[in-house]
Amino acid sequence: SNTTLRATGVTSSNCAMRAIAGLSLLLLAGCDKATEPGFAEAPEVSRHTVAYLKSLCDGRSSAAVTQDITIRGFITANDLYGEFDRTIVVEDPSGGIAIAAGHPLLADDYPFGAVATVRCNGLTLCNYGGKIELGSEPGDYGAEAIPREELSRYIRVTLPEEGERHRAAPLTFGEVSARHIDTRVRFDGVRFADAGKTWCDTDPETGRTVATERTIVDAGGNEFTVRSAATCAYATEPLP
């Protein structure tokens, strides 16, 4: 029988998805340089995995990070195409985490594919609907954003080392689990069941696009739900 799973992420831009054979999903001017807070190097012993960092918030609504904990991973999502407003996602082999960042143009300074080193001491982990996020403090809707003028104190962006590259993990629908939240995965040989529709529906009263769920189907007839943000730049474009 068909299996329906629900995705919590939003789709990546469909600009390069005219063929539906492969589909990628994701399961985030300062002050004067003389006064801008700088990124302090952390000892190697402070390096931990994303999974370890998130485990500090297990069973809790929030947890302040008071240890010297540093994570390092690829930036696999940002606000490019309107998908993750004021959010970047950092992913390492153990998992991914969304970081709330008070910057209106994150994609410029925190581009997809770059490497982010994040010093977490002084930040806060928040559990919002079962999803662990990192930010400045707890808020009503998850982690509050790290102020723009403080981002350079906590996050350093560098180019990948030679031969270092992020690759989306190829999965089947049945292999998706909680550990894949905020990670970039790939489904091969799938198609949209909603042919002819746009990525997002439009509210007939306001004329505005709304967050919309669409269904993809694999060769075995299994289904997976893909949710697209109302703010995405391709909301009114047809599904591939």
Place the predicted regions along the sequence by residue.
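Bacterial N-terminal signal peptides that target proteins for export
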Residues: 4-20
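Hydrophobic helical h-region of N-terminal Sec-dependent signal peptides
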Residues: 21-25
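C-terminal motif of bacterial Sec signal peptides marking the signal peptidase cleavage site
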Residues: 28-30
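OB-fold nucleic-acid-binding modules
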Residues: 32-240
